[in-house]
């Protein structure tokens, strides 16, 4: 299985939706709470050039946010990323 990392905050409904979506896909993930770690928040903002959460990475691929992940899945691109070897 791929290495999935999701950057979240406690009060973000799209973060909850993204975690639920990944769980339904059977994907395990590591969650990084950027509201609790300003250093991680700065790192993900620099890496993605985005200020919103969630931000989802599958291995070295930046998927984007929840809507981006769902759109990728509809195009058939999410399953291959999740199935890739880490």
Give, region by region, the residue ranges found by the protein language model.
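Thioredoxin-like thiol-disulfide oxidoreductase module
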Residues: 34-51, 80-84
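ATP/adenylate-binding site constellation spanning eukaryotic-like Ser/Thr protein kinases
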Residues: 9, 50, 75
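Structural alpha/beta surface segment adjacent to cysteine/selenocysteine redox centers
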Residues: 25-28, 41-53, 57-63, 67
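Local sequence-structure signature of Cys/Sec-based thiol-disulfide redox active-site neighborhoods
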Residues: 1-28
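Residues that form or flank phosphate/diphosphate-binding pockets in enzymes
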Residues: 13-16, 39, 64
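Non-catalytic, surface beta->alpha helical segment in thiol-disulfide oxidoreductase systems
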Residues: 58-85
């Amino acid at each position: 299985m791929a290495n999935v990392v999701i950057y979240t905050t406690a009060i973000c409904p799209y973060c909850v939706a993204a975690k639920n979506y990944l769980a339904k896909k059977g994907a395990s993930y590591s969650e990084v709470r950027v509201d609790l770690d300003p250093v991680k928040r700065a790192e993900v903002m620099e890496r993605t050039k985005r200020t919103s959460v969630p931000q989802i990475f599958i291995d070295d691929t930046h998927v984007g946010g929840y809507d981006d992940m769902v759109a990728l899945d509809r195009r058939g691109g999410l399953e291959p990323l999740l199935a890739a070897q880490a």
